[in-house]
A protein has these predicted regions:
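Aromatic/basic-lined ligand-recognition segments
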Residues: 381
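Single conserved hydrophobic/aromatic residue that forms the stacking wall/gate
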Residues: 425-429, 433-443
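Short, flexible, mixed-charge glycine/proline-rich loop motifs
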Residues: 27-35, 46-50
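Short cysteine-rich clusters marking metal-coordination/redox-active sites
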Residues: 40-43, 56
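Structured aminoacyl-transfer and RNA-binding surfaces used for tRNA recognition/handling
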Residues: 66-376, 385-401, 410, 414, ...
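Cysteine-rich micro-motifs
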Residues: 51-64
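Short, intrinsically disordered terminal segments enriched in charged and Pro/Gly residues
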Residues: 6-31
Length: 443
């Protein structure tokens, strides 16, 4: 089902872009603030800006991240990012609802909650069931293993921003019976948060036109960028795919905004990667336990460019890595020797956090369905541990995550006894040897 939907999206992408012209994206704020529609000199996509910059703001188009080392106030940790984002919208008429499980038990087409809108598909979006509030916000943990050949997983630790589980700040309004709001109000709120909370100047904000689809629905979207980072995607859900390969208009128009909550924290801290901002004391413990240290000056220069290494977006990843190394004035092999162990810790911390959330919500590593994906990341974490001879106590690591996360997501405590009972770290030696080969392949 996911493959069929992905195929439909690819087929319709260009057609939909033609359908959604300038008039589909121009909101009142653009007119009032003097935003102009331009075509990016790098990717040729259309975007809106108040500056004379010829680039859309996407990481690869502007040459990397431009906010590294630029702390905003005291910076927000993971918990502060969730709270401050929710508080902003609650003060502006939104109701915060409890997040849904990451294991999508109410869906028969996907194993995991992949976006906050998943919580409301298909029944709320189709008007069959009333939304729990309107408008609403939900700090929804999401799991994604997508990409060609698990490339999303391969990106973890390398691009500085990829996570297999992330918290999507879902901002939703359902337009019916005079309730909800539409594009103008959506971008008003969006721009206010970016400029007042994240302290971006007007000229630093750009909105890139695109089309987003997921869960059988789609619509035009405006991706908001600041200093080389996509912070939020504003989707204006208006259509549904049909069984005969076409599409129809939805009776209820839905504001489907997905904020990258971990990205917000990363942006405010200006830390080298999203992992320092997200995992906090857990990553500190990992570094202390393994003795991994790194050239901070090299790491600082590298992470600015690391966003250019997205496996899904680069035709030749080896060449891209060589190019990054060349810009840093270092051989690719030496760069890997310097940063490889740290990138492995990033991946291990990500994968184990994902497992904690999934297991707390009833997911178990196995050979079938979504459980197979969980097994993949478990094996990859164990493999990287073996490859670099970290000798980590994984049971302790899982409990470190639980202790840190429970401040905001108390339900992760449910994973504690299950992890102990499953003995997840007791894997046979032949399997571990195969896993080491897998880890080497992924490097």
């Amino acid at each position: 089902l996911l493959f069929k939907e992905g195929l439909r999206i690819m087929i319709f992408k260009e057609e939909l872009r033609k359908k959604f012209g300038k008039e589909s994206y121009e909101v009142e704020l653009f007119k009032r603030e003097g935003f102009e529609r331009r075509q990016c000199r790098s990717c040729n996509e259309w975007y809106w800006t108040t500056s004379d910059n010829e680039f859309c703001g996407d990481t690869k188009c502007v040459g990397g991240y431009k906010f590294i080392g630029r702390r905003i106030g005291g910076g927000w940790d993971f918990h502060e990012s969730v709270k401050n984002w929710c508080d902003f919208f609650e003060k502006r008429g939104h109701t915060r609802i409890s997040e849904y499980p990451v294991v999508a038990r109410w869906r028969d087409d996907i194993p995991f909650t992949i976006a906050s809108i998943t919580d409301f598909q298909p029944y709320v979006v189709e008007g069959i069931v009333e939304p729990p509030a309107n408008p609403l916000v939900v700090p929804q943990p999401c799991i994604r293993f997508g990409g060609k050949g698990f490339n999303d997983i391969d990106n973890v630790g390398k691009t500085g921003r990829h996570l297999s589980l992330f918290v999507m700040g879902g901002q939703h309004a359902f337009n019916y019976d005079g309730k909800g709001y539409w594009m103008d109000r959506c971008i008003e709120l969006n721009f206010e948060f970016l400029t007042k909370c994240l302290k971006l100047n007007r000229d630093e904000v750009s909105y890139k036109e695109d089309v987003w689809a997921g869960g059988g629905n789609f619509g035009p979207c405006l991706e908001a960028f600041g200093r080389g980072l996509e912070i939020v995607n504003n989707v204006f859900m208006q259509y549904a795919f049909t069984s005969n390969g076409t599409y129809r208009e939805l009776d209820i128009k839905v504001i489907d905004v997905g904020w990258g909550v971990e990205r917000i924290g990363w942006f405010t801290q200006g830390s080298p990667t999203i992992y320092e901002a997200t995992f906090g004391p857990v990553l500190d413990w990992l570094k202390e336990s393994t003795g991994v240290s790194v050239d901070e000056e090299l790491l600082g220069r590298y992470t600015v460019l690391s966003g250019l290494l997205n496996v899904d977006e680069v035709d030749n990843i080896d060449k891209a890595r060589r190019d990054v190394a060349a810009k840093l004035g270092i051989e690719q092999e030496d760069l890997h020797k310097s940063l490889g162990p740290l990138e492995a810790l990033y991946a291990i911390s990500d994968h184990t956090r994902t497992l904690v959330f999934a297991i707390a919500d009833g997911g178990i590593p196995s050979n079938i369905g979504g459980g197979y994906n969980l097994r993949i990341i478990l094996r990859r974490a164990l493999s990287l541990n073996d490859l670099y001879s970290f000798e980590l106590d994984f049971l302790e690591l899982f409990h470190k995550h639980i202790e840190y996360l429970k401040k905001t997501y108390r339900r992760v405590e449910a994973a504690s006894n299950i992890i102990n009972d499953l003995s997840l770290i007791h894997i046979s030696e032949p399997t571990r040897l195969l896993s080491i080969s897998y880890a080497v392949f992924c490097l």
